[in-house]
C-alpha cells in the first residue's frame, strides 16, 4: 500500500492583504452664507444669513438665533452695511407706504 503524507502542507498568499485606511470620508456641506441679497424684499422671520460665530452682526430689525443665524424681524428691504471700521452688519428697513 502506498501512503501519502499530506499532514504538513502549508499554503502561502501570493499577494499581501490589503490594509485599511483612516481616510475616505467627508462631512456634509452645511450650506452657510447669505440667503438674502442686498436690496431684496423679505418677510418677517426670513433667514438672511447662516453662519458659525458672528461674521456679520445683526442690525436694525434683525435678530440672531441660537446658532448665530440672522433673521428678519419685520417685512422690509435688506441692507448689508459696515459697523465701525472692521465689522459688518445686516439690517432690514420697512418699506414706506
Swiss-Prot record:
GO terms for molecular function: structural constituent of ribosome. Disulfide bonds: none annotated. Signal peptide: none annotated. The N-terminus is cleaved by ribosomal processing cysteine protease Prp. GO terms for cellular component: cytosolic large ribosomal subunit. Residues 1-12 form a propeptide. One of its GO terms (biological process) is translation. Residues 14-37 are annotated as: Disordered. Keywords: Ribonucleoprotein, Ribosomal protein. NCBIfam families: L27. Belongs to the bacterial ribosomal protein bL27 family. This is Large ribosomal subunit protein bL27. It comes from Streptococcus gordonii (strain Challis / ATCC 35105 / BCRC 15272 / CH1 / DL1 / V288).
